[in-house]
């Protein structure tokens, strides 16, 4: 248990230090949804185009769907714990969408926690994945905050009422990691 907590602290500290550099102002108010960044040429240009990569999970990760609180199901990439567990790590994508790089990160985090935590990389763009900065900006700008909250709440319901949830994300996902901790209320552990 100490190893899991230590790993989460290291990962969260690292991600928070990065997220402070590019996306710190987006969630300064309850209305911030990061779309303001999509018109900032420096912000857009600071994102390197992801290298081509096709992920094949070695730990059993697979795409799933789950019910949300609106009419459209949510999607995610799930790596189930080796043992029955109510411990969950929600992984939030950066502005590119739930691409194969995020799936790889989910697998890495799963392995770092000894395979004893359910890891769910949540698709915040309903299946859209950007390969250009322009598409990434468009997807982030058009992301509807209510829909995103419905996706998070659907993921929480999928995890179950007894789930203890930690979260991590990068840039866009870092903001949603924070928001999901707020939405998770007593289920949030980090």
Residue ranges of predicted features:
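Primarily recognizes the serine-hydrolase "nucleophile elbow" in alpha/beta-hydrolase
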Residues: 154-190
């Amino acid at each position: 248990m100490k190893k899991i907590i230590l790993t989460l602290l290291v990962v969260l500290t690292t991600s928070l230090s990065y997220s402070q550099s590019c996306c710190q102002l987006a969630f300064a108010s309850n209305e911030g949804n990061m779309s303001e960044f999509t018109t900032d040429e420096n912000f857009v240009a600071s994102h390197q185009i992801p290298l081509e990569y096709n992920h094949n999970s070695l730990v059993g990760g697979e795409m799933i769907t789950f019910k949300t609180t609106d009419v459209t199901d949510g999607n995610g990439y799930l790596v189930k714990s080796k043992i029955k567990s109510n411990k969950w790590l929600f992984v939030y994508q950066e502005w590119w969408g739930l691409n194969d790089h995020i799936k790889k990160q989910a697998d890495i985090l799963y392995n770092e926690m000894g395979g004893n935590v359910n890891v769910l990389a949540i698709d915040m763009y309903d299946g859209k994945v950007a390969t250009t900065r322009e598409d990434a900006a468009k997807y982030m700008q058009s992301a509807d905050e209510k829909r995103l909250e419905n996706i998070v709440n659907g993921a929480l319901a999928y995890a179950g009422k007894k789930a203890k949830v930690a979260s991590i994300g990068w840039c866009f996902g870092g903001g949603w990691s924070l928001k999901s901790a707020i939405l998770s209320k007593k289920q949030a552990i980090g």
